Structure formats: structure tokens, C-alpha cells
Amino acid sequence: MTEHHTPKSRILRFLENQYVYLCTLNDYVQLVLRGSPASSYSNICERLRSDVQTSFSIFLHSTVVGFDSKPDEGVQFSSPKCSQSELIANVVKQMFDESFERRRNLLMKGFSMNHEDFRAMHVNGVQNDLVSTFPNYLISILESKNWQLLLEIIGSDAMHYLLSKGSIFEALPNDNYLQISGIPLFKNNVFEETVSKKRKRTIETSITQNKSARKEVSWNSISISRFSIFYRSSYKKFKQDLYFNLHSICDRNTVHMWLQWIFPRQFGLINAFQVKQLHKVIPLVSQSTVVPKRLLKVYPLIEQTAKRLHRISLSKVYNHYCPYIDTHDDEKILSYSLKPNQVFAFLRSILVRVFPKLIWGNQRIFEIILKDLETFLKLSRYESFSLHYLMSNIKISEIEWLVLGKRSNAKMCLSDFEKRKQIFAEFIYWLYNSFIIPILQSFFYITESSDLRNRTVYFRKDIWKLLCRPFITSMKMEAFEKINENNVRMDTQKTTLPPAVIRLLPKKNTFRLITNLRKRFLIKMGSNKKMLVSTNQTLRPVASILKHLINEESSGIPFNLEVYMKLLTFKKDLLKHRMFGRKKYFVRIDIKSCYDRIKQDLMFRIVKKKLKDPEFVIRKYATIHATSDRATKNFVSEAFSYFDMVPFEKVVQLLSMKTSDTLFVDFVDYWTKSSSEIFKMLKEHLSGHIVKIGNSQYLQKVGIPQGSILSSFLCHFYMEDLIDEYLSFTKKKGSVLLRVVDDFLFITVNKKDAKKFLNLSLRGFEKHNFSTSLEKTVINFENSNGIINNTFFNESKKRMPFFGFSVNMRSLDTLLACPKIDEALFNSTSVELTKHMGKSFFYKILRSSLASFAQVFIDITHNSKFNSCCNIYRLGYSMCMRAQAYLKRMKDIFIPQRMFITDLLNVIGRKIWKKLAEILGYTSRRFLSSAEVKWLFCLGMRDGLKPSFKYHPCFEQLIYQFQSLTDLIKPLRPVLRQVLFLHRRIAD
């Protein structure tokens, strides 16, 4: 940017870091017209009408263009030689003739060369080999009046340079932009790096960096592949001699191979420190037999390690620390699991027996490594573990074998320190990825459970196999049909969907069947092999279309908001028809195993009715949102009926009103799918769903796979058909039926309808093969069948809990549910042990708490002012509960900054203030000020604080902030005094 135009928005700062030279079109015009006074911009603009001049000036100052190098002196004014459309056609054709990198330009989307099915374009009366296969609307933007006028000002040469070398970004409302030319920015790997502190590159530094060696991968982005230890069910004896190549350990070449394996970077081999996303093992290709000088001291230690590993019996150590337990049918499955401390003791014993003490440097470093290993084993299912975290507390100067030569006491220079750190980091990376993880994979079945949420559970593989056998046998008989090998080969050749792999999730005394449809398979096709795309990847177009059909039915209201909108509408209707004062009857039911009981033939008939339109268009675009410290990308796939498709230019205008600091990048070339194609893919997925169990393959006869990307959409259609078939009376005046997946809450002022709904659910829905769970059925009235839940059939209980909130049985006010800091909440949390743990912690707390906080909770047209205030209080209380659960998990690992509470209050204040503005209007007087919102939230956090966290550094500012806000808003309003008086009861 030039000095007189400093970018202020976050998205512009992000763009500035992606290009060597970023400027507005106005700056580019001034650059082109330098030294051309006769054709200056001011002289040309004087001939325009005032309104056109204003519009054109805004266009020049708001449109941004980025270059990989600063435009050279040769970019000067030249009179236009052709029209704008002809110039664009020539630029696109030139891109097809250039390198592959240039071919990814957005302007080329929708064009092809020498296509037989399309008529070629003509430029200046001469046939061009360029043909249009799909309308690229970005071209029409560049052919608009403003761009034609710009061509007259800067000329053909400068316009050609701008279109071919630059990336152009059109300004949208609220500091948003649309990319209309250049290589799509979502292809850049910049989204995990910070964007506000990156130094702006000059042309000279850019050239120097391009000539430098392969760039170092950040240790924060090098993660230990912990996900690979989960769900390894195959029971094979671990052949350590074969895995570690120990048969000829006395051979010098074997030890040399170990050195290459552990320290690949020192031998010039491909490694995780220089190649991102190194998913597979790279074969050792170094032919050099010379050991690098830096590894001469570790050579005898590695040789000693290999010999010890050859002598040790891993099975004996395993049976000692993780003994076999006899299984019994009456006990819970989790009672047979191993404690993480047992697994840790097993691995610690191996490390002590296999590795020499000198390889760790000293006992202090070894204890740090053991502590990190214990943390690694106790992490939950979705928690990550980076190399930066592992290396953060290790003192490199204390490791003797890293010293080059005999000068152990000499002062280290920076380059020597970095080299030592690099070598030991390679060893730590190998220790986890190639030593510890293979042992865990071989001896344990590792999973999460339904009861313990995300907590990692360890089983002996032989015990796991015995526990699973009865359940798998019954599932084979009830839901699956075995197919012979000949049919398998025929089906594999016909289908585009690979077979699915199942896994079992422990659930009290039984299991839940989970189907993995994200896995890719390598199959034999005659003499060749073919890698199949995963089932979920193939079915994404179908998922987009089913989502579109659901949005059409619900008028575009998201799933998570539909329940609240129905409740709001129901209350308004009761008030309108003067039925609000009548007693309200509540029935809550839960469908048993709904996914496993869906009838496939009925499902096909339902979906076929929904696919009314003959053809659908699927549009895909990317959004890049810039925050103060990073940029995140997201891919969106949307489906439309062919005749209802809205141009993307209008779509981004609407999206820009709801967001800020976002860049939109369209894929341009859309997909089209006919209804018959969609139905065929769906039928192939369900009726031809092949599941691999052991070495055999089975066909699923009943239900739909829970791991499918389509499951939630198909379940929605199936449930809606059930409602139309059995529960149409719930749509009468004075009644409402709320549904979240397989949970129903029926509210009515008619007791007969409530009893009818209850009796129907108790009998079951035979046509749809559904029955209800009696222990989860809740009512608030007496019933002749005697099915009464004593907990809720009580006059003192005035609220009905449902899906993260509770409904007042008289006023229908809604209160946000408050989680308790118990084992379930602790097990549901996950932390990322990376460099930016503080930011990750802050955003996790924010997202997890605000995700369930809908506008209805502070809508005073639905809730009373007191209950709206209570919901803000409960938000603070629940956020404090979650924060303490996270801090409990991060104990002795990380302490967030002391300004955590201040930052949280500021963000929450803005978020809730915005929600109030959306409900009551920005011009209306809101019933709470920003300071009062923060005070309520702070009061909730204070009351949610447990004694053990009262003096935690993270909450030091809490009491101070609460007192400051109390002094600021005095005297308190009556509603706030009421909250303060009853605050101890509000969270119950």
C-alpha cells in the first residue's frame, strides 16, 4: 500500500501479507499515468457526469489488486487497441498457453481450448480456439462500465498486465471482498499462521527467499499422529525383530540404517521438518555410509539400544503391567478397561530397559519426557500434541552427545544451539511416531466410549475381541446379510462406493455400531489397483441437495434454531387466540435406536416424493475470514433447483450484510445433477451398502449407516413422514411439536391430545418400525396407564428440560441449561497442546458456550425481563463451569493470561449487545446497557467459581471486574436487584 492509503481492516492486512505489492486501482492508475500529463486521470474524469464520476471514484479507491512483484517501469499508458471483452479473451487464451501455475487463474474457469461440443469464440473477426463451456460471471464483472472506462484511462497494455499478473478483489459492504481474478487465495497454506505480525516482503527479500533452501516447517504444526493409535482392532503378535530389523543387529549397516531412520534430516532425506503433511513412510534412499560428525557420539548409544531391544520380551512386560482378566456377562464393558497408569507403567518400563541413560542427557530430562508421555496417554480423543510442546521444557545444553567434539563446557553460539535442538527434536519425533505409537497399536485397542464421552479408554486386544464377539454375532443375524466372494467382485465393479469399515463404541453393557465412511480403499481392478474415493466424499453432492430440500421446507431456518422459532410462534398463537391462560400439557419421548430401525424401502419412497425438480445445480465457494491474529478458511457447498439459482454476485451481497473482514472466492464452474442421478446414488448407498467385518463382507438389510454424511438428512425426512402419518393432530391450534433428531416434546392445551400422543408413542409406530424408550418418557399429568415420571409429576417442578434448555410449564419462558462441573463435562473437553494454547483455550470457551445461546433467551417479547437477565447470568455461570473443566485438564501444563476475564467480558458484551440489537432494532432502546450485560455475566461467573479455583491466576480479575461494574451501574434497576437477591437459586 502507498503511504497515503493505510489499510485498516483485518482482511486488508491479511491480503497485504499475501502479496509483495498490494494497492488500490487508483494507485495503479497513478502508477501507469506517471509522465503522461495529457492523459492524466483528472483530465479524463472531468468529462464524466458528476454521478458517474463519484461512482467511478469509489470503484477505483475500493477495488484492491495484489501483485507477486511490483509493476515495472514498462507498464505505461497506451491507447486502447481493442474492446474490454476482446482483451479478456486474449488474456485467457494466453493463460492456457502458459505454465500450469497460471492455469489456475479464476478467469480461466468455464473456458476450454478446442472443445468439440462448443462453438469457438471470435476475436476481431478471427476464430479463437477458446470456447466457453460454462458461463463465468467474473468475466461479466470485468466487462462492466467501470472497467471499460478504466481501459480508456490506462490503455490496453496496462489493462493486459493488470488482468494477467494481478489478483483483483472487488469491495463489498462491511469490509468484505470478492476475488474476481488471480489464483484462488484458498489454495495458499497460510491459514494457521498469524497475519498481523508478518513482515511485509520487499522484492529483494522475496527473491532471496525463493533462492533459499527448503523452508523449515514450524514445530507447532508438526503434530504427533496420535489419531493413528485409535481403533486398531487386528490382533497380530508384535514381531519386534522384524519391525525394528534386529535380525542382523551386529551388522554395521543395520545401525547405520537406524541412524537414517531416526535422523533423516542429517542424511538429506525427506523428513517431517521440511515437508508438511508427511503421511506415509519415505523409503531410505541415502547410499552414503558416512556417519555425520554430529551423530558420532550417539552411534554407540543407538547400537546399544538396538541390542537391548533385541533381548527384551515385550510380551512379558505387557502381561506383568496389564494382566489378563476373565470376562463375565453381567459386568459393564468399561470395567475390563485398563487404567492409563497401567499403560504408562508398561511404556516407562520399556523405555528404562531399552534406552541407555546417556541418550536422555540426564535424569531431569528423562523425567520431563516421562511426564509428557503420561500426558500423551491421558489426552482425550480429539486433543492434539505438537512437537513444540514436547521440546519446550528440555534443556539442550545438558545433553552430552549433542556436543560437537570435546568442548562440552564451551559457550554455545546460536547456530550450534539451533543445530543441537534440531537433532534432539528429530529423536523425540521418532520416539513417539516410530517407537511408542507402534507399540500402542500392537498391544492395545484404544477407543472412546459413550459413557465417558471423549476420554481415551485402553483395552487389551484379546479381551476386547472376547467382549465384542457376542454383539457382532447378533448384529450379523439381525441387520446384515453375508455375500459370497463372486457377488463381492461383481458389486465392486458396478459400484462407485467402497465397502465401509465398522467399529464398536462401548456403551454400558453393550456397544454402539459406528460405520466409517470416510476411509479410502485400494482395490484390485483386474491386474491394476485403484484408490476409491471415500463414500462420504462421493455423496457430498447428494448431501447438498437434501439439505436444500430441508431448507425449502423450513424456510431456510437452521436446524438448531427451528425449535426456538416454533416455540416463539406457538406462544404468540396462544396469546392471539386467547388460549394462553389454559393449562399446558407436556409429553417428552425418545425413539429407540432410530438410525438402526429405519426401513430402507419406505425411505426410498419418501425421498422420491421430495425430488420434484428435474435438475439441481451445486455451487461451491470458499470464505476466508481474517481475525486479529489468524485467517481461517471454510468451504461451502450449496444446492439449488436449476430454475431457482441466484447469481453469486447477489449471494455475496446478502452474505456481506451478516459478516465482516471476509474474502469470498467462488469456484465458478458448478456441478449439475438430475433427480434420477441423485436417487440412483442414494439407492446404491443404502441398498448396496457393503460392510466389511473381519475378512468377510456383508450387506446391510435394515437401517441407515450412522457414519454417513446423509444420515441426519434422511432421518429428518423419515421423522417428518412419521409425523404426517401418525401425529398430524399435533399441528392443530393450541399445540406444538418440537423435535431434535429422535427426541420429541409435545405441548398442548388439550389434555385428550396429550394422552393420545402418549398412548401412540407407548404402542410404537409400527409402519416406521419405531418404538419409544419408557425410561426417557416424561409427562406432567396423570395417566390411566400408570406411566408417570415421579420426578416431573410434581407441582413444585415448574420446568420441562429439553435439548439444552428448559421450558416453564405455565409461561413457556425458556431458560438456558447450566452444566455442572462433573466427570461428564470434564470428559467432553479437549485441549490442544500447541504453541498458541492461550488463544485456543479462549476461543474454545467462547464457541462452546455461545453455540447454544440463541436469541430467544434474551428476547423480551417471549421471556420476561427477569428471565432474560437470568439467561445472561446462566451463560456466565455455564462458561465458568466450562473454563474450570478446561483448566482442570490443563493443570500443570498451561496457565492462561491474567487478562482472560477482561477479554472474555468485552467479547461477550459485544456479542449479546448485538443480539439485543437484532431483536429490538438498533434504534430502539434496549432494556439493558452494555455495562449491565457484563455485570450479569460477571455475576454468573463469580457464582460458578469453585473454591479450588478461587485464587487461580486466570480468575484474579473476576472479583475486581465485578466490583468495578457494580460501582458503574449503581443504583441497580429493580430487575437487576431481583437477580442479585435470587442469584443463588437461578443456577439450580
UniProtKB/Swiss-Prot annotation:
Q: Name the keywords, alphabetized.
A: Chromosome, DNA-binding, Magnesium, Metal-binding, Nucleotidyltransferase, Nucleus, RNA-directed DNA polymerase, Telomere, Transferase
Domain of life from the UniProt record? Eukaryota
This protein's GO cellular component annotations are: chromosome, telomeric repeat region; nucleus; telomerase catalytic core complex; telomerase holoenzyme complex; telomere cap complex
Positions annotated to bind Mg(2+) = D590, D742, D743
The protein's Enzyme Commission number: 2.7.7.49
Recall the GO molecular function terms of this protein's record.
metal ion binding; RNA binding; telomerase activity; telomerase RNA binding; telomeric DNA binding
Its localization reads:
Nucleus; Chromosome, Telomere
Q: Which reaction does it catalyse?
A: DNA(n) + a 2'-deoxyribonucleoside 5'-triphosphate = DNA(n+1) + diphosphate
Q: Which InterPro entries match?
A: DNA/RNA_pol_sf, RT_dom, Telomerase_RBD, Telomerase_RT, TERT_TEN
Q: Which Pfam families match?
A: RVT_1, Telomerase_RBD, TEN_TERT
| Biological processes per GO annotation | DNA strand elongation; telomerase catalytic core complex assembly; telomere maintenance; telomere maintenance via telomerase
Q: Where is the Reverse transcriptase domain?
A: 486-807
What remark does the entry add?
Deletion causes telomere shortening and senescence.
Task: Indicate the quaternary assembly.
Answer: Catalytic subunit of the telomerase holoenzyme complex composed minimally of trt1 and the telomerase RNA template component. Interacts with est1.
Function description: Telomerase is a ribonucleoprotein enzyme essential for the replication of chromosome termini in most eukaryotes. It elongates telomeres. It is a reverse transcriptase that adds simple sequence repeats to chromosome ends by copying a template sequence within the RNA component of the enzyme.
Q: Which family does it belong to?
A: Belongs to the reverse transcriptase family. Telomerase subfamily.
State the protein's name. Telomerase reverse transcriptase
- What organism is recorded for this protein? Schizosaccharomyces pombe (strain 972 / ATCC 24843)
